[in-house]
């Protein structure tokens, strides 16, 4: 409804020569100077409140320089970068953590199947940002959590040892506690469950997502 109702706002601002980006009722106006920004803010307020009879949230409406970063739709847009807002990354990791509890008792494949839609949705939305480092860190952390789940599902070290032998491991077996979070980053766990193994299980790999792309339907 907001998109339809605010079409008139979009058109009038464009006719006045302003470059805007809007999603629902979140609006970003791009200007070349502070004076131009003040003018655009005044005109936008006049259209929204005077013509469309809407209220403008003065606490959220402000002018800032791109060097300081502009927060918009979960990303922070700067002169030289666009990054995911830290609070969005924290919330995303909290969801992943909730879905990868070691006491869940679900088969690892079921956990991965449940994770993939969330991973796809998040990465597709935020691939506009320069997020390759953040995606790589999350992918590594998530694989460790999944290794921890599988270790607990195996329960006994003998099952891990058998799995390792079946997959070509010929070294000695160091002591490993199957329920320890630290064990999930051990050499034995990494050998038993390499990154390629998770690819075979179909885990969506955030490291493969191309980031830092901007697609605009507004540009002419």
Stretches found by the model and what they are:
Residues 1-220:
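Non-catalytic terminal/accessory segments
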């Amino acid at each position: 409804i907001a998109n339809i109702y605010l079409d008139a706002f979009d058109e009038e601002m464009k006719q006045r020569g302003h470059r805007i980006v809007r999603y629902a009722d979140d609006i970003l106006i791009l200007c070349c100077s502070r004076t131009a920004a003040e003018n655009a803010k005044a005109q936008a307020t006049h259209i929204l409140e005077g013509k469309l009879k809407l209220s403008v949230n003065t606490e959220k409406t402000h002018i800032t320089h791109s060097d300081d970063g502009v927060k918009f739709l979960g990303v922070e847009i700067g002169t030289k970068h666009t990054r995911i807002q830290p609070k969005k990354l924290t919330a995303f990791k909290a969801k992943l953590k909730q879905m990868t509890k070691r006491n869940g008792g679900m088969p690892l494949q079921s956990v991965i199947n449940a994770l993939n839609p969330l991973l796809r949705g998040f990465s597709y939305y935020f691939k506009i940002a320069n997020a390759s480092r953040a995606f790589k860190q999350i992918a590594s952390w998530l694989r460790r959590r999944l290794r921890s789940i599988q270790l607990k599902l195996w329960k006994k070290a003998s099952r891990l040892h058998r799995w390792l032998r079946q997959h070509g491991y010929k070294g000695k077996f160091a002591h490993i506690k199957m329920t320890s979070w630290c064990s999930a980053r051990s050499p034995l766990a990494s050998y038993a469950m390499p990154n390629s193994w998770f690819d075979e299980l179909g885990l969506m790999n955030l490291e493969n997502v191309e980031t830092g792309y901007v697609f605009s339907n507004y540009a002419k």
